[in-house]
């Protein structure tokens, strides 16, 4: 799994904002040639979502709509509909971190401007720490500054893209994870409150089922295997 936009045939990496060395690389075929076995490449968050669905038994009947929100260095998003990952025409569906957020300034790693990932990401959290809380370790930023207006605005901004996608898909479950969301004292209650406030009422706002997994280093590996077997059916 890679933090990148990957082709429909699970081989070519189109864009990788946070790992530039992977861009425009046919990684799937390179791995196949090197290993002598078929190799499939996909976004890492797709594999994480497949692992989470299995661990929490979220879709035994293969008829659910499940959204994955993974806040790490960037803002990862995965879509699962009726037993399958949804990838769209070109394989790049679910790039929620790269929808425009009006008023956002700066150039995103993807090459666009106004991408919400410029505000909704672990990278931006680190920028806030460096500018406003330079004496605080990043691991303690929510513990020491969770009630600061700067951090509250950061959390509130996260709610906009998440609530937008929930309103669009009316999902059965929304998985909330990633390195930032599992940080010590992350204000999840406030984030959920803001998401519900901004989601369409009465539904889906009044019936959102959030799931909070804890990942290990093998989560994506297992999810990759699950995704492969699901694609072969």
Summary of predicted features, one role per range:
Residues 10-24:
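A charged helix-plus-loop insertion that forms the helical arch/lid used to bind
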Residues 24-30, 97-101:
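Short, acidic/small-residue loops that bind anionic groups at enzyme active sites
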Residues 39-44:
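General beta-strand structural signal in soluble alpha/beta enzymes
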Residues 6-12, 29-37, 53-63, 103-107, ...:
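ATP-binding/phosphotransfer module of carbohydrate and carboxylate kinases, centering on a glycine-rich
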């Amino acid at each position: 799994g890679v933090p990148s936009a990957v082709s429909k045939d699970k081989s070519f990496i189109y864009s990788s904002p946070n790992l530039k060395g992977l861009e425009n690389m046919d990684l799937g075929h390179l791995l196949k040639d090197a290993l002598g076995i078929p190799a499939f490449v996909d976004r890492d968050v797709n594999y994480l979502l497949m692992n989470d669905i299995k661990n929490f038994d979220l879709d035994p009947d293969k008829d659910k709509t499940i959204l994955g929100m993974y806040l790490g260095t960037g803002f990862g998003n995965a879509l699962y509909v009726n037993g399958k990952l949804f990838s769209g025409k070109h394989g790049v569906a679910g790039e929620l971190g790269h929808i425009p957020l009006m008023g956002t300034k700066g150039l995103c790693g993807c090459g666009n401007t106004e991408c919400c990932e410029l505000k909704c990401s672990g990278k931006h959290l680190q920028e806030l720490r460096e500018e406003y809380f330079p004496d605080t370790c990043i691991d303690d930023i929510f513990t020491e500054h969770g009630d600061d207006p700067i951090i509250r605005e950061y959390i509130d901004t996260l709610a906009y893209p998440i609530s937008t996608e929930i309103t669009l898909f009316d999902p059965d479950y929304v998985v909330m994870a990633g390195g930032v969301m599992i940080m010590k004292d992350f204000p999840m209650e406030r984030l959920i409150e803001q998401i519900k406030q901004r989601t369409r009422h009465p539904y889906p706002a009044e019936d959102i089922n959030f799931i909070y997994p804890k990942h290990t280093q093998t989560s994506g590996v297992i999810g990759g295997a699950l995704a492969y077997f699901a694609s072969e059916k």
